[in-house]
Amino acid sequence: MITLTGHTLTIEEMKRLLLEGEGVTACPNSMQKVAECREVVEKIVEDGKVVYGITTGFGKFSDVLIQKDDVKALQHNLIQSHACGIGDPFPEEVSRGMLILRANTMLKGVSGVRPLVVNMLLEFVNRKIHPVVPQQGSLGASGDLAPLSHLALVLLGEGEVFYKGKRVHAMVALTEEGLEPIELEAKEGLALINGTQAMTAQGVLSYIEAEATSYQAELIASMTIEGLQGIIDAFDENVHKTRGYKEQVEVASRIRDILHDSKLTTKQGELRVQDAYSLRCIPQVHGASWQVLNYVKEKLEIEMNAATDNPLIFDGGEKVISGGNFHGQPIAFAMDFLKVGMAELANISERRIERLVNPQLNDLPPFLSPEPGLQSGAMIMQYAAASLVSENKTLAHPASVDSIPSSANQEDHVSMGTIASRHAHQIIQNVRRVLSVEMICAMQAAEYRGIENMSTVTKSFYHQGRQQVPSITNDRIFSTDIENITHWLKTNYSIKERLDVNAAL
């Protein structure tokens, strides 16, 4: 059970929450702050003060005063009208993350909701009732209005949820769990939907997958180094320490550890003086992608613990301030950066694939074919990888440089952060498939070189891979092989924990 405080949630805890189904509880001190802040909102309503989103309309309607008797209707209408999401739903892990992050931000005690609302969010998390939230429709400011409205709907007993492996009406799950839908009161609808939790939850899942995929890329690249009898000197610690980037040093160190007892690597001058960049520069390129990941992790952990709704309530109600913390620009930039960093892992992987299959670049059978000419072997697998790499270049176009005004130009600059976050996740899926092609080719090359000559780590990795796909002895439908390795990498070389190279032993 992980305790939410509004201030201390980490990526490591989110791994447990999203991927292992761990439960959550609220810090009592934080819940007390929630209750105290709620008293301020109720006094504002009672006194008839004019405060945005509590006693006024929203967006361009912020100058419309709402009567006390209509305050509840205002919040319900807000959720109904803003539930304009379209397209396929987010992965269930993302909608679970949205519930967790929305509860965590409310526990900062500046949003003005009742403790009941926070408790309801936590009940959904712990009972694994996850909102069906369409992926498209958010501008990323005022936050993720459309996606979060679909989240809010299910608290009211409306909309759909994922529950016990099925997609059902929210009331089906609530009834089975013995829960009553809530009725929103002043400020609560706005507090639920005005924030960045859709882009951030998707960003967190993308980061977790990207981290695991990056470790996997090092193992797979190490197998390719063996298949091409790569020069190990290029990974010498002295080379990388003189550059000064810790991530580069760490990648080189891990590859040295993976290959420390390999009989397939060579010394410079033994077969050739230098390797091509796609081998020799693995630490520099992969290390730079790790720099991106470290940046993204830092920004996500800030946003996971941020108050991103509007208005915010401070000093016991002395200050009720309309600001712009819902603007998703920091996450939009981070997700666009993640897109570039991960796309580059596929770029260099595809070039290593080419070196494995091109007979002009190695002494292996052409296209790793068991019968060159009669059988094409891995020829078209390289095409598939090249296609994914090209697709990634399109997806990597920065969403954050775009902005379209909305709400009659009141909201005249937006982040498009949710688009960036979604595209980052798509890129990561493509990267995993490119790496799967590289692994298939590297395993085949290892068989020509002699499996007994592989390092202890890569040999173990090879044998586990061969449990997923057989050796290429004849042409067959290779799309199945690619998907099998892709699924295995995602579920077993898992996104649940950081890949330690020793885990392959």
UniProtKB/Swiss-Prot annotation:
GO terms for molecular function: histidine ammonia-lyase activity. GO terms for biological process: L-histidine catabolic process to glutamate and formamide; L-histidine catabolic process to glutamate and formate. Pfam families: Lyase_aromatic. Its EC number is 4.3.1.3. Pathway: Amino-acid degradation; L-histidine degradation into L-glutamate; N-formimidoyl-L-glutamate from L-histidine: step 1/3. There is a cross-link at A141-G143 (5-imidazolinone (Ala-Gly)). GO terms for cellular component: cytoplasm. Contains an active site 4-methylidene-imidazol-5-one (MIO), which is formed autocatalytically by cyclization and dehydration of residues Ala-Ser-Gly. The modification 2,3-didehydroalanine (Ser) is found at S142. It is found in: Cytoplasm. NCBIfam families: hutH, PRK09367.1. This is Histidine ammonia-lyase.
